[in-house]
């Protein structure tokens, strides 16, 4: 019996089946459109695959360093592609700040943009990660190997889809402000597995 303990522990720590990933941290965004609260997006992060990227996003969600996502906006929305946010320094997609004090390197490209509901780092080129991120609304294989995937939407994909459908201007900025009114962490007692699939039955596969 004891001979089974170590393999089972290793399985729990480092993953389940080949088609699953282990969520090690949970975070949330409470969203407002204008002054109207519309709901919460809950996201799972993969700290065993991309620990530095996960920690950056986690600490920016909690605001434990005195800065982070609370009060920032989704500044770029493209239907059948993604919604982008995380620029809490300038608010227009030209700013951002990581917990590491500078842009940090692409950690790895082990994870792919498997479908709708995946979190990935926005960047201005190779090894240029700060705080900007995006949430996919379709499968995006052309981004694999270029943007670091680090999380998945667990709850609130309907909120993501609502944002995706909002009217935008010529720069893809929502006409009405989409604000992260509050962000933070959700206690996670035990890591759990999620599938490498898109979120939502109506996901586009293009």
Curated annotation (Swiss-Prot):
Keywords: Glycoprotein, Isomerase, Rotamase, Secreted, Signal. Residues 1-19 form the signal peptide. GO terms for cellular component: cytoplasm; extracellular region; intracellular membrane-bounded organelle. Residues 28-185 form the PPIase cyclophilin-type domain. Component of the acid-insoluble organic matrix of calcified layers of the shell (at protein level). Its main location: secreted. GO terms for biological process: protein folding. InterPro entries: Cyclophilin-like_dom_sf (IPR029000), Cyclophilin-type_PPIase (IPR024936), Cyclophilin-type_PPIase_CS (IPR020892), Cyclophilin-type_PPIase_dom (IPR002130). It catalyses: [protein]-peptidylproline (omega=180) = [protein]-peptidylproline (omega=0). Its EC number is 5.2.1.8. It is found in: Secreted. It is an enzyme of class 5 (isomerase). Gene3D superfamilies: Cyclophilin-like. Glycans are attached at residue 129. One of its GO terms (molecular function) is peptidyl-prolyl cis-trans isomerase activity. It comes from the Eukaryota. PPIases accelerate the folding of proteins. It catalyzes the cis-trans isomerization of proline imidic peptide bonds in oligopeptides. PANTHER family: PEPTIDYL-PROLYL CIS-TRANS ISOMERASE, PEPTIDYL-PROLYL CIS-TRANS ISOMERASE D-RELATED. Belongs to the cyclophilin-type PPIase family. This is Putative peptidyl-prolyl cis-trans isomerase.
């Amino acid at each position: 019996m004891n001979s089974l303990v170590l393999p089972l522990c290793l399985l729990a720590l480092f993953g389940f089946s080949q088609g699953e990933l282990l969520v090690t941290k949970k975070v949330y965004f409470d969203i407002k459109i204008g002054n109207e609260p519309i709901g919460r997006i809950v996201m799972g992060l993969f700290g065993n695959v991309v620990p530095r990227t996960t920690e950056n996003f986690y600490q920016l969600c909690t605001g434990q360093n005195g800065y982070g996502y609370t009060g920032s906006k989704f500044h770029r929305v493209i239907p059948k592609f993604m919604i982008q946010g995380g620029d809490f320094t300038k608010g227009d997609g030209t700013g951002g700040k990581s917990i590491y004090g500078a842009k940090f390197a692409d950690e790895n490209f082990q994870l792919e943009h498997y479908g709708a509901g995946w979190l990935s780092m926005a960047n201005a080129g190779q090894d240029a990660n700060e705080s900007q991120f995006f949430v996919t609304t379709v499968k995006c294989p052309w981004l694999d190997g270029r943007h670091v995937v680090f999380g998945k939407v667990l709850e609130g994909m309907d909120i993501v889809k609502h944002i995706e459908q909002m009217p935008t201007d010529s720069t893809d900025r929502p006409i009405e402000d989409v604000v992260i009114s509050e962000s933070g962490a959700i206690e996670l007692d035990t890591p759990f597995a999620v599938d490498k699939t898109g979120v939502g039955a109506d996901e586009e596969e293009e």
